[in-house]
From Swiss-Prot:
Protein's recorded name: tRNA modification GTPase MnmE
Domain TrmE-type G: 221-388
Cofactor binding notes: Binds 1 potassium ion per subunit.
Similarity annotation: Belongs to the TRAFAC class TrmE-Era-EngA-EngB-Septin-like GTPase superfamily. TrmE GTPase family.
EC number(s) stated in the UniProt entry for this protein: 3.6.-.-
Binding residues for (6S)-5-formyl-5,6,7,8-tetrahydrofolate: R23, E86, K125, K466
Residues that coordinate or bind GTP: 231-236, 250-256, 275-278
Signal peptide location: none
Subcellular location: Cytoplasm
GO cellular component, one term: cytosol
Biological source species: Flavobacterium johnsoniae (strain ATCC 17061 / DSM 2064 / JCM 8514 / BCRC 14874 / CCUG 350202 / NBRC 14942 / NCIMB 11054 / UW101) (Cytophaga johnsonae)
One Gene Ontology biological process: tRNA methylation
Family matches, as NCBIfam families: mnmE_trmE_thdF, PRK05291.1-3, small_GTP
Length: 466
């Protein structure tokens, strides 16, 4: 499947900038680069050592296009495992295109999306899960997602899967051997040891599967719905959290007619805050649509903030309590923060009345002033406490990829079938079938088992120059 042609693409983001990097990889990469490069020291790139830098000019039919710095990487000691050069030129879009067009005329072709990393995988520089981590690393926008992607790219997840696969494969070989000597009625695989191995594999698989609940939201941002009566300061709170004017702030009830989303990183974790239209009963058609969207957003949220105006609590306490209970009853498993706004102008008696009437609702209660930004940092810390960051702190493997999660679920199902087969004295040939399916799922994760369609789907999500 490895193409022998040389590919070229812009490795830096498209558009003008201080510099741009153009990457070429393939059997003829260095010779093609050498044909358009004139070194200031008259060096021949094809005769240079790997991992060297060379200053010179890109020349097209005697015309100098740019002064550049060329990096030479000889295979297999390169990212792709092939001969590779990278041309660092000035970031003019005109210069970029002129150099790329020149390289195409000299024998390169434009790289497909993710083709450089695909070649790295096909040449054994990365396994499939590591290759996918490259894309995650590029798209990471907070400390946690960066940490997870780096760990996976360095082989943390791959090594864990490879170890499970190797141990299971060793026993599978013994089971297959028993089938070859079926008439002898002998057991080469110690059933007690095999059962212990299956228990270990099951434990690891369950831990990895459970980690996806954390990993998936870290990768995509943890959605937090800010809900409550209209005009209680939800937009002001959102702006205080984000330190910018994002939502429409007005004194007219129901101003936030639609859901508004923005992102914030707290303690290295990405959160997506969703300001909604409130949940009061209304006859206004437009506002009713917004309220419907509020409940849709609560469905999607991992955490719910119910915000109300502390000055209105005395007159409307029964309504507030009813709405909080409605949310708790409809979403009993979602973490709920009850946040009281306008703390800065509440009397001690008002604060006492609020805390006494809400203390039995079994939800965390915070008093803040969104306008004065009082209590905002405490709110951020509470949000962070809802995220299970123990696995991150302990440097454990965390699964973020849906494809991996699916294969882990299927592998666990097969392992449990094997355990059941052992416990019920199922024949070795049937047990062997379930073992093979578990091994197949492990192989899908690392790429030891793959096909063109699978690889095409994975690498199509990469940028062209990677």
């Amino acid at each position: 499947m490895i193409n022998q042609d040389s590919i070229v693409a812009l490795a830096t983001p498209s558009g003008a900038g201080a510099i741009a990097v153009i990457r070429i990889s393939g059997a003829e990469a260095v010779s093609i680069g050498n044909s358009v490069f004139k070194s200031i020291k008259n060096k021949d790139l094809t005769k240079q050592k790997t991992h060297t830098l060379h200053l010179g000019h890109i020349v097209d039919n005697g015309k100098t296009l740019d002064e550049v710095l060329v990096s030479v990487f000889k295979g297999p000691n390169s990212y792709t495992g092939e001969d590779t050069i990278e041309i660092s030129c000035h970031g003019s879009t005109y210069i970029q295109q002129q150099i790329i067009q020149l390289l195409l005329r000299k024998g390169c072709r434009m790289a497909d999306a993710g083709e450089f990393t695909l070649r790295a995988f096909l040449n054994g520089k990365l396994d499939l899960s590591q290759a996918e981590a490259v894309a995650d690393l590029i798209s990471s926008d907070n400390e946690a997602s960066h940490h997870i992607a780096m760990q996976q790219m360095r082989g943390g997840f791959s090594n864990e899967i490879a170890k499970l696969r190797e141990e299971l494969l060793n026993f599978a070989s013994l089971i297959e051997l028993e089938l070859d000597f079926a008439e002898e009625d002998v057991e080469f695989a110690d059933r007690t040891q095999f059962h212990e191995l299956l228990n270990r594999i099951e434990f690891v698989l369950k831990r990895l599967i459970d980690s996806f609940a954390v990993g998936n939201v870290i990768k995509n941002g943890i959605p937090v719905a800010i809900v409550g009566e209209p005009n209680v300061g939800k937009s002001t709170l959102l702006n205080a959290l984000l330190n910018e004017e994002r939502a429409i702030v007005s004194d007219i009830a129901g101003t936030t007619r639609d859901t508004i989303e923005d992102e914030l990183v707290i303690g290295g974790i990405g959160f997506r805050f969703i300001d909604t239209a409130g949940i009061r009963e209304t006859k206004d058609v437009v506002e009713s649509i917004g309220i419907k969207k509020t409940f849709e957003k609560i469905d999607q949220a991992q955490v719910v903030i119910y915000l109300f105006d502390g000055l209105k609590f005395k007159a409307s306490s029964s309504e507030f309590v009813s709405e909080i209970e409605q949310i708790k009853n409809k979403y009993p498993l979602k973490p709920l923060l009850i946040v009281v706004n306008k703390k800065d102008i509440l009397s001690e008696d008002e604060v006492l009345n609020i805390t006494q009437k809400l203390e039995n609702l079994n939800a965390k209660l915070l008093l803040i002033s969104a306008k004065q930004k009082i209590g905002v940092e405490e709110l951020k810390n509470e949000l962070l406490s809802f995220v299970n960051t123990g696995a991150l702190r302990n440097n454990e493997t965390i699964v973020t990829n849906t494809r991996h999660y699916d294969s882990l679920l299927k592998a666990l199902d097969e392992i449990q079938k094997v355990k059941f087969g052992l416990e019920t004295n199922l024949s070795s040939d049937l047990i062997a079938l379930d073992i093979k399916e578990a091994l197949y799922q492990f192989g899908l994760i690392t790429g030891q088992v793959s096909n063109d369609e699978l690889l095409g789907n994975i690498f199509a999500n990469f940028c062209i120059g990677k």
